[in-house]
Amino acid sequence: SKIKFQMFIRLRANQIDMLNKRSEFLRAKFESKRILLTNEIGAQISMANNLFPYRISFSNYINTTDLRFFARYNFLGGLYIGDEEEGMIISYTVPGGIPIFHDISKPLLGKTKTSAPAIVFVGETGAGKTQLADLEAFQNMIFKGMKVLTVDPKGDREKKIKLLGDNAAHLKIGSKDCSSGMFDPYLMNQNDDREALGQAMRDIDSMLNVLGLSIDTNFRAIEKAHYDMLKDYENRIIHQKTLTYLISEKLVKYDKTTAEQVMTLANDSTMRLFFATQESRYDSAFNLTKPYNLITFEKMPSTAGEKMENDPNRLDNAIFAMLFSRVQGIIDGFMKRFSKQETIVVFDEYKVYQKTPGGEEVVDNVVRQARTLQTHPFLITQELSSISDAILNNVGEIFVGSLKSSKEIEFILEEMKLSNHPAVRGALIDHTQDEGVTEEKKYNFLMQDYNNRKC
């Protein structure tokens, strides 16, 4: 059988004569391999329709044009092979239309003033910050082979999962597809009883906090229950160690009140993930080894107030704090597993992490390990001012889209030392909801790169 494929080649030259020479040389090379350059016909037309949505057909074999002609159809159109410039084109300056070449690998290679690889994308809803972050992630995934892990509390990337098919993995925490007990400390640490015990102690302590009970955690009782369970496992009374068995069958003998109270959580739609049965199996979803990996949540947490005990959503927030502790373990495993190659970890809706107890620590942990584990953290938020100083001090690059808050605009201009530039201030004012606004005004971004340059 024959394999059919189509290549679309763009040649670059500063002069028409040189362009013609290169095209003739290329044509000769193709013909020597029995490959003829032809007009688009038949199957090629459908290919062109997919590549160029507006159906631009070419009447000549060679078209003389500029870079922007190609990039306006598809972000891949702005790419080319060669080392004349470094990086990939992500956008164009306004005004001027000068292509912006971007290489997120440079900080890790010591080729920039800052060695911090983290990037922050800021802007209002609809300003394009998520699209820009995903553009960066997908470009580097496709052309550099970087694996991507995205943690998205709002869960609006499912179309991308369907598009990528077998090249993507999706862990939707709390969904019906998640088996009960997938976060059970004994299932997650099957070969390390000591680590499993330590995690079980922390989990039970956190569960008492979830319930809001004024009960001191009896760690000694948990330890006794643990060793009793190990004996049952060695004697083959049970074939699997679980937190459920530890609490319901063993801890109840030493601390009945704690055991009975904690077991009431086993029926909660989310907390069931911490309670395995003898039939539960370690969830394969933790093997996030695809080019693109996504973690979402079936249920979004409410924003926690400063006084969590007075919050009517205290239970949900406390549960979500426990989930974040498990998410941190998943992210750490992903980063360490691929530490010999560059990876990207995307945190969308940063404010959710900030407002959920333990959430910001997850982000901070990734940012601090980024250089050591060759990771590029992407943080997406509506407010740069919401990011803690500890994290912001480890950010190397910032993209700022349109903003509604004048206070936030002033904070960013002060952070970037651009307070005396009224034109920049005007460009950041939100136009996403303006009637008849042009694309150029709607999706403008202020960029500060790894070398502290602004555009």
Which positions does each model-derived feature cover?
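Glycine-rich phosphate-binding loop of nucleotide-binding enzymes
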Residues: 86-173
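Conserved H-loop
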Residues: 152-153, 348, 375, 380-386, ...
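A short helix-turn-beta junction within AAA+ P-loop NTPase domains corresponding to the substrate/partner-engaging
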Residues: 168-171, 390-402
